[in-house]
Amino acid sequence: MKGLSIRVQESPIWFALAEHLDFIATPISFNELYTALQQGTVDGQENPIASISSSAFDEVQKYMCLDGHTYAPESMIMNLDFYNRLTDEERAWIDEASVYARDTQRQMVTDMEEEMLKSIEDKGVDVCREPDLESFRKATETLYQDSAVTALVSPELTEGVKAAVAQYEAEHGEKGEKGHD
């Protein structure tokens, strides 16, 4: 990525990431991105597969790397007081339905993304499905210490996330390399 101009959201954290990965962070609005790619204003961009497909970025970019650097989970939220007033049976229904909805949604996203990737590849885009993630990890291992990050994210949150990742890896024996973005 060294020296490439990559469209990013206007955010201090994205600018810090650019420094760690040695690319040029170029903030451009999403609505202007197609033209920026087409005219060579930027060399690349990062977006979910669905956004790349629906915005036809595959018409103006030749390469795509599935590095899984972000994941945007959806949350089911309910007032705890309301939940606690439900009967055990009603809570069990909600818990069961929540797990079913989560699993179904994840499979639907996986299936839809695979269809979109096939279409993107059919249009001639070279999709790298297994990039060298270790080089990304090494380049960003101290990102959380960057002043742009610490100004926005508390050390306690950072340590909590690191602990959760370590626990996941210990339980699952993997580094979570299969992202959706």
Question: What are the functions of these language-model segments?
Answer:
Residues 2-181:
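N-terminal secretory/targeting leader peptides
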